[in-house]
Amino acid sequence: MTDETLRLTARITGVVQGVGFRYWTARKADELLLKGTVRNSADGSVELVAEGSAADVDSIVKWLHSSRAPGRVENVDFQVSDATGEFDDFRIID
């Protein structure tokens, strides 16, 4: 088992605005003890940045792809890199 902390940067497209997607994503991130942000983008997508253990980052990626995520997720483009440690908690950005 590794203690490596990773950073997930994701762009989620589909019907993901106006359906509580950011709220439920923040709730899931809190459940997984992830730190970062989620925000709506002008193009109708949602941007997610989350840092945490490799297992927790993997869990939120799987959740985003699942039918449990609110709205209708059509695509999740994401990158995983080393965490920066810049976040103290998880926040929804308006």
From Swiss-Prot:
What keywords is this UniProt entry annotated with? Answer: Hydrolase
Domain of life of the source: Bacteria
Top EC class of this enzyme: hydrolase
- Annotated active site: 22, 40
| Enzyme Commission code(s) on record | 3.6.1.7
Q: What InterPro entries would the database entry show?
A: Acylphosphatase, Acylphosphatase-like_dom, Acylphosphatase-like_dom_sf, Acylphosphatase_CS
Q: Which residues form the Acylphosphatase-like domain?
A: 7-94
Task: List the NCBIfam families.
Answer: PRK14427.1
Can you name this protein? Acylphosphatase
Task: State the organism of origin.
Answer: Paenarthrobacter aurescens (strain TC1)
Q: What is the lineage of its organism?
A: Bacteria, Bacillati, Actinomycetota, Actinomycetes, Micrococcales
